[in-house]
């Protein structure tokens, strides 16, 4: 399989492939970040616990160009609270959503606790490929398939993320320009990261990557 940069020509329908590769990272001390990727709070929680290492994207209503693009190799995880529903999650993670929903959703602030690096980006375009990834995500198969069926002529981007815990949570004001169904947000405030620690060790993370890629019939163990 060739490894192509974001925006590369789409492969024949039905063939999963790698479109971007970002170097792995270890425990490190970083300064600041102003780029964030929106995701349901319950999914961010699963990423933070190592229950999941992937996100799926095609785009949001307010996405620039209406299509999702992998614009940044690393970013803050921006937890969102709208549209989360128990029936869109597997039973194993419905209690976690119930816990999240019992807490008042912040309206005027955003708290960042996790930072992520894209390890690889895969593209898929078939329902059986989405179904094969089912063991690796917390959503129902029906919800994951709905991501695929939206704009069916475009492939679904599957981002494999190495997630890091920030040294301490950072809370910033929520601004009107952050609202809307878009994936990427430029945070006005420079968010200090401090020392970041991976939520999964190197061997455990690579094992999870191999499991995801193996489910799609891709070569494992090397990039």
Where are these regions (language model features)?
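Charged/polar low-complexity intrinsically disordered segments
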Residues: 3-4, 13-15, 86
């Amino acid at each position: 399989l060739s490894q192509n940069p974001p925006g590369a020509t789409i492969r024949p329908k039905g063939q999963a492939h790698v479109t971007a590769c970002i170097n792995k990272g270890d425990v490190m001390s970083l300064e600041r970040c102003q780029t964030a990727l929106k995701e349901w709070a319950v999914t961010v929680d699963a990423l933070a616990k190592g229950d999941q290492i992937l996100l799926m994207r095609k785009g949001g209503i307010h996405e620039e160009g209406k299509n999702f693009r992998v614009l940044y190799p690393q970013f803050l995880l921006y937890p969102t609270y709208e549209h989360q529903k128990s029936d869109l999650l597997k039973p194993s993670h419905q209690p976690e959503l119930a816990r999240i929903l019992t807490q008042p959703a912040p309206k005027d602030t955003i708290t960042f606790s996790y930072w992520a690096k894209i390890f690889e980006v895969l593209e898929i375009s078939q329902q059986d490929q989405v179904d094969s990834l089912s063991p690796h995500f917390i959503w129902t198969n029906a919800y994951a398939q709905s991501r695929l069926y939206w704009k069916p002529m475009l492939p679904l981007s599957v981002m494999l993320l190495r997630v890091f815990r920030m040294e301490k949570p950072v809370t910033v004001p929520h601004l009107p320009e952050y609202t809307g169904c878009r994936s990427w947000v430029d945070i006005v405030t420079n968010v200090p990261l401090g020392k970041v620690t991976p939520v999964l060790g190197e061997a455990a993370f690579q094992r999870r990557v191999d499991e995801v890629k193996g489910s799609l019939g891709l070569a494992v163990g090397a990039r």
